[in-house]
Amino acid sequence: MSASDQGAVGEDATGEGTPWHCVVTGALGGIGAAVVTAAKNAGYRVTAVDQTPHGHSAGSDGDGQTGDGKRNGDVAVVGNIPADLPVDYVLDVTDAEAAQTTIDRIEADQGAIDVLIHTAGILRADAALDGDTDAMRASFEVNMFGAAHVCAPVAQRMCERKRGAIVVVSSNAGTTPRAGMGSYGASKAAITAWARNLGLECAPHGVRVNIVSPGSTDTPMLRGMWPAGEDRSADVIAGTPDQYRLGIPLQRLAQPEDIAGACLYLASDNARHIVMHDLRVDGGATLDS
């Protein structure tokens, strides 16, 4: 698909005929990195944001936030990342003040944000029956509050300019219960609901907010849940009836590029009349529940 097909080239937020400026959070993760690559290939000017300037954090779920939801060292650094590193700005999304400062800096340095694709998040495996409130707080700090710290101030700027698109990567676990994923599912349900409310409030200003909800995707996040050295893809595809988990009708895991394509579609002018939509990209795993 060409850049013009994706709507990545045209009048940007300044009214000039230049490539649109797309900011991607969680840019080092499996999905985030695929979004960065796809956006660049589609003709966007891309600004990559992650918690660490290179590689995955220790315990990372593959999208740049540590698996226990805690800060990983000096992560609230803003800007001035060496040019040879893949991340343009370093941000811990749980730090609201740093998020505001980073957004200010990005727009000052790179220009107004036309598109935001927020992929940052963590995955914790914990049972709701355990009532582990620490796990709940950790999941919500990143998956819910972290998204709000980034998306709300960007949306405010877009509303002032009367244009823009935001895509929030959530999960099909936000709408379909998963045994052993209590805090993760709850946090994703929360961000899905919040993003739809944000979309409702932004729509009168010409700003579109949508959600992409992946299913099982072949990323470090998913493989990090399996025993070391084991490939559990076949089990995921087949499903686990004893845990009331359906398999994947399409008989394959999603690839990060599948999720990236959905994100870019919703960000593009091809989706100009779509808002508050939750697009499932899970191979039919939730039977569209």
Residue ranges and their predicted role:
Residues Q156, L200-E201, R272:
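Alpha-helical segment proximal to the catalytic Tyr-Lys
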